[in-house]
A protein has these predicted regions:
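Residues that cap or initiate secondary-structure elements
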Residues: 16-18, 69, 85, 99
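Hydrophobic beta-strand-centered segment that forms part of the acyl-chain substrate-binding groove
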Residues: 39-88
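Hydrophobic alpha-helical segments and helix pairs
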Residues: 77, 81-122
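Hot-dog-fold acyl-thioester-processing enzymes
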Residues: 1-58, 104, 111-140
Length: 140
């Protein structure tokens, strides 16, 4: 199931924190979007040819942190998918610091037709998601 996961390790920089040294949430969400895009490309559910026609958008997202992330913290972000429905697909993110899980995020993504501004089933445009058993969620 390793191919269902994507990772990024980074050290938090000064321009990513507030005046108290805590990581801005919008930077965290941007990193999530980046690793989700890399993951989608790796899984074959998004490519650059789709850019002007279709786009994956977050319909709902929930973030939980057990502790704040600070300037110069080294964090590992990871993401994976789970089984979806006809038009919505869950994605999970994990935040580790010092090899400890300090946060999680869950999101629901839908595919939009950019011209029609409507949800579209990925199957209708030839996208097939890989099987994603729930057991692999525990391995992150």
């Amino acid at each position: 199931m390793e191919d269902l996961k994507s990772y990024e390790t980074r050290v938090i920089e000064i321009n990513e924190v507030d005046d108290m040294g805590e990581y801005f949430f919008h930077h965290l969400l941007n990193r999530f979007a980046q690793i989700a895009t890399e993951s989608a490309m790796k899984l074959g559910v998004w490519n650059y040819d789709m850019m002007s026609k279709y786009g994956w958008v977050v319909a709902k997202q929930y973030l939980h942190l057990d502790e704040p992330i600070h300037y110069q913290d080294c964090i590992e972000l990871s993401t994976t998918i789970s089984k979806g429905t006809y038009v919505s697909f869950p994605r999970y993110y994990y935040i580790k610091k010092d090899n400890r899980l300090i946060g999680t995020c869950s999101s629901v993504w839908t595919l939009l037709d950019s011209q029609k501004r409507r949800m579209v089933s990925p199957q209708k445009i030839g996208i097939t998601f890989p099987e994603a058993p729930l057991e692999h969620l525990l391995e992150l």
